[in-house]
């Protein structure tokens, strides 16, 4: 793939990104800022979202900005990904299925100078998408239909930089521009009386800063451990919200200044590396959503997540493409930030497995692209009674292009 083709591809992906299907159809996206997107790329998704201790010159790891210092001297990486999913909703004996597709991320990584790497990319921060209704009997001759719809989301273009001041220490910083629109609408339709509607609208324009660090401890030539940590401080999201209440005879509008807050986030983890063949690790993430407001009224629950994963790479170099496939699997358990009923939230767990398949040039010597494929099962179960269970079967597909942009060619 030449530079012109890559430029065209990047331009198209950037242009269609905000307009692609947001890939969500969940009633739980009506809470807060919606369903939080997976803030990771191809290899992380194969390992349950693991990433605080991962670093590699072959892949981009946006989970920890300190990993950008591992960028290769002579190459530039481009990575893009999509996902396809089938969702099952269960409420009592009732079941409904839905299918979604989404554009998930676009990123690039390159070396600025010795021991300094940079990454630039685009991915969603959260997604909102739902539409459902329920019918109630208000009396002998009157019924009401409650309807709920929502759409929108928050997007996150970012730029990150990392520096390796010591052979075993890297520090990094990612700055993101957070922007988007969120709309919720709730309506009540009566058979014999006045209809009512409440509309929630928010426009978000803010920023997000993530600070990362990684430390490598080598035990011998075969064994090492990489420790990683990331911190992001919370602040107002500069989100002006509007609530409009209407019925057949009147309309009221309320303006809310700074209707949303971004939570502070802390995460830490490690990766144990054995001969660059086996890698295994654990991550923990905590987000202080209980200090965040949504439309100036409701608050969230503190979110925590534990991830674990393993990677197996049979060999570094081989003429047999199948011997260079890298295999990964992982799992996670999380408590989402959404408060759905009487102070109670949900439990979420997921398992994933996948592989990365390299493609070689005509001389079978250099990999210009790596295909990432993973399957994922996710279950979301509410702690409150009378709520909906959600189960996801998801296929993640990503591709990394490895271009030798900085190689000096010799003319004979």
Predicted features along the sequence, with ranges:
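Generic N-terminal leader/processing signal
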Residues: 1-2, 215
